[in-house]
């Protein structure tokens, strides 16, 4: 379920299995990117992909950072499928913005080198679930 409400930020709520989107997102591309990011988080719950990174999001900064990277990678794949991504850095949905977001979280991941492949694999699973290609 998706609710576009007046919250100051967008999020996924496990309590009611709902993506909450800020009604003030700046443009269509950014809206979809944010929606896909939060939708990716929703795949981590028990009964779906049951990701440790989602289950322990609030208890470990390392796992929180990993979950954010998974969600952003998944959103990037979905945006590319919808032709919403761009190499134009003036575009609000440029690959540069995605890279910057992931790099910010990367600093909090203890062993980035061995973790990156796992994160990409988890993002691919989330993407497949959302697209219904499992």
Please state what every model-predicted region is.
Residues 29, 33, 43-72, 88-102:
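Post-HEXXH active-site segment of zinc metalloproteases
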Residues 38:
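Walker B catalytic acidic pair
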Residues 62-63, 76-134:
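Long, well-structured alpha-helical subdomains associated
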Residues 12-15, 24, 52, 72, ...:
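Surface-exposed loop/turn and secondary-structure junction residues enriched for glycine/proline
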Residues 1-34, 42-50:
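Active-site scaffold of zinc-dependent metalloenzymes
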């Amino acid at each position: 379920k998706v609710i576009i409400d007046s919250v100051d930020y967008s999020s996924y709520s496990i309590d009611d299995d709902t993506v909450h989107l800020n009604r003030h997102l700046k443009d269509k591309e950014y809206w979809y990117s944010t929606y896909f990011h939060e939708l990716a988080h929703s795949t981590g719950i028990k009964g779906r992909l049951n990701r440790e990174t989602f289950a322990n999001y609030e208890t470990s900064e390392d796992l929180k950072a990993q979950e954010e990277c998974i969600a952003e990678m998944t959103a990037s794949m979905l945006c590319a499928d919808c032709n919403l991504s761009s190499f134009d850095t003036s575009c609000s949905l440029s690959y540069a913005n995605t890279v910057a977001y992931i790099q910010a979280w990367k600093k909090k991941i203890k062993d980035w080198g061995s973790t990156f492949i796992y994160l990409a694999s988890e993002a691919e699973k989330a993407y497949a679930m959302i697209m219904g290609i499992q």
